[in-house]
């Protein structure tokens, strides 16, 4: 955490194809000028609640080719965020094993007991 905090003017962050398995809470909080965030082709199963809430300038985000865990209720933040910001998603984040779009996941199909 804090690794990007001093980069407050950063507009483009490419973290694709880095075998990331998790994002630290608050890792993007200071990146208010970020317009492009690339997270595709990693090993992300969910993102922390509020992970993208401070990215007020974001216009494009890439989340495809990650094994999103749509059985665990932790996915609901990302699902809701993507539904609210549909025009920003480049490609499509889909659930591991089902190819359901992450933005289409509902609370009824998830459970806290299914989280790792």
Q: What is the predicted function of each stretch?
A:
Residues 60-116:
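Membrane-proximal C-terminal cap and juxtamembrane stalk of leucine-rich repeat ectodomains
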Residues 38-43, 48:
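Short, amphipathic alpha-helical segments
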């Amino acid at each position: 955490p804090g690794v990007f905090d001093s980069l407050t003017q950063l507009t483009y962050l490419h973290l694709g194809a880095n075998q990331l398995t998790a994002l630290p809470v608050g890792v993007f909080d200071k990146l208010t000028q970020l317009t492009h965030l690339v997270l595709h082709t990693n090993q992300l199963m969910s993102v922390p609640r509020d992970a993208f809430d401070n990215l007020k300038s974001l216009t494009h985000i890439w989340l495809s080719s990650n094994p999103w865990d749509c059985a665990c209720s932790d996915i609901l933040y990302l699902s809701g965020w993507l539904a609210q910001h549909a025009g920003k998603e480049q490609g499509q984040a889909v659930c591991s094993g089902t190819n359901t779009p992450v933005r289409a996941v509902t609370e009824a199909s998830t459970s806290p007991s299914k989280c790792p």
